[in-house]
Each structure stands twice: as structure tokens, then as C-alpha cells.
Amino acid sequence: EYPKELSKLKTIFDWNKYDNQFKGKWVDYIETEFDRREHGFWFLNKKQKTYITGTHYMYLQWTKIDIGLPEFRESNRIFFIYWEACKADTRCFGMCYLKNRRSGFSFMSSSELVNIGTITKNARLGILSKTGSDAKIMFTDKVVPISTNYPFFFKPVQDGMDKPKTELGFRVPASKITRNNMDKNEEDIEGLDTSI
């Protein structure tokens, strides 16, 4: 469960305002979450040691779906392991996945889209659906809320609105260059230059 003290923080800029004592209290928790995102997570499921991938962990831990938080399903675990194999195999260009309705695939794929979008530099990620309006609904009803629900430490710098209608831009917001601010040597903020 996400600690209440951290849930108040919305961006890394909020985190930077706190003192080292506060940061020291939470740095292990944050590093553990990054480790689980990258390497996956082992847990006991009915007394059976069970591994889930980092992508599956992000889906279960940080994705809210239409009924609340997703439940663990063995079929999803197998799907995510197979998906990691597809990503690791340089000969693979993706997968064809036949599914039934109400299987959670739209939320799983939206979760993966946000997960990849928040760690990848210089990427353009998209949604393909049977119609443009269906893709837009998936973006506004699934992708954006998943991104919004991420804790501050997984959120890169974002340009634009907090609930965008057409694009999530993980880049430094543009600012107007004038004679007065041309020579300012402010702290450089680095963005991913990635958009969904």
C-alpha cells in the first residue's frame, strides 16, 4: 500500500522541498519499488513461490481499473512472462494475442504503454484500435488515469495538461526565450522527450 505521507507528493519538485530526514525515511521504499519494476517480484501465492515480471507488478500495484485494483490471475502472469520474452527476443516484432471480452487486456496493455512511456527516452508510443474514437476513449479513460495514479517517483517531467485529451508528453515544458532569460543559468531539467 502506498504510504499516505508520500501520496501527498505529486511531482519530484514536491519531493525536493522536503528535508533529508524525510527523504531518508522513504528512500528505501522508493528504491524497492524501482527494483520491483525492473526485476519483478516474488511472493507466496497459496504457499507456492510465484514470480511476476516488473511489468505485471506495475499493473497489479499501480494500475486502477474500472472495478478498483486488478486481481492476480495466473493467465495474466503467463501472458506477462511471454510478453517479456517477446521484448527480449530481437527477432520478435510483437505478438498476436486472441482474447475474449472482459479479460482485462485493455487495462493490461494501457498499463504497459504507461510503464514503457515513463522509462523510455525519445519514443513515440501509440494506440491502435478499430476506430479513432475507440483509441481516444482508451487513451482518456485508461492510459491517462493510469499515468495520473502513478506515484511521484515514477512520473517523469510532463508537458501540457494534467488530464490531456490527445497526448501525454513526457518532456520539459517549453518556455518563451527572451533577452532577459537567455543568459539565466537555472537548474537544467531533463525530460524523456517521449509521447503517448
Regions found by a protein language model. Name each.
Residues 1-196:
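Phosphate/NTP-binding elements of NTP-utilizing enzymes
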